[in-house]
């Protein structure tokens, strides 16, 4: 385990594996740096960096939370792991962080963003405000209820999957991450940030699962349309959850091509040609 220090002094824990240009993985809700296990094919071509987002695993946290602090955390890991702008693969809210950090000025060599969950009019709306309700459940010691609320009202997992939480040994690990669930809401809640995405100058690949709900498919299409030069790719046979083995060939192809494209990889902020 290694430690980077974010702009506010918070420690951010990260691991590295493999060899080659740096590829940082930014994960979504209920995930830690151990969630994404890099396949050998990816490790042969890239130095893969996984990190605990603030408040998770071995990383610290500092109140009050703002989305900018998540962007600062990614910047700190990037600075600690290389001298060149890194590639970033983001999944779910981790994809939103990568996109919004780039829009805020973080130099990146390329971004592959899988289903950043920016909502739209088609997104199912929970009866209660997610951030407020989860915060109340956590404050009153009802973390198990917070997990169930997220799974049922936000992730919309089937009832049979919810039933698996009862007595599951991994349920405690999910409960430990519930204080960070409102952070995921904060970075995505206002919908596709079209003005922010329009300012991105790094190569971007927007990814989605062909089996995902219609609102997800619409959201990623809107993200691609708002981002200059971005490419949209829908992956057959997958929904919001996609294993590393399935995404690896796509990441290798996109990031290899991005390395040959004039961009912020040279350390400037000029729009690629």
Q: Where are the model-predicted features located?
A:
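Conserved alpha/beta-hydrolase "acid-adjacent" motif
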Residues: 213-219
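Short beta-strand/loop motif that positions the catalytic acidic residue
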Residues: 200, 206-208
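Active-site loop/oxyanion-hole signature of alpha/beta-hydrolase fold enzymes
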Residues: 40, 49-87
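Conserved HGGG/HGGXW glycine-rich cap/lid loop of the alpha/beta-hydrolase fold
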Residues: 3-60
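Helix-rich cap/lid subdomain of alpha/beta-hydrolase
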Residues: 116-169, 184-185
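Conserved hydrolase catalytic core segment
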Residues: 84-122
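Hydrophobic, aromatic-rich cap/lid helix
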Residues: 168-193
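Catalytic active-site module of serine/aspartate enzymes centered on a nucleophile-bearing elbow/loop
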Residues: 228-273
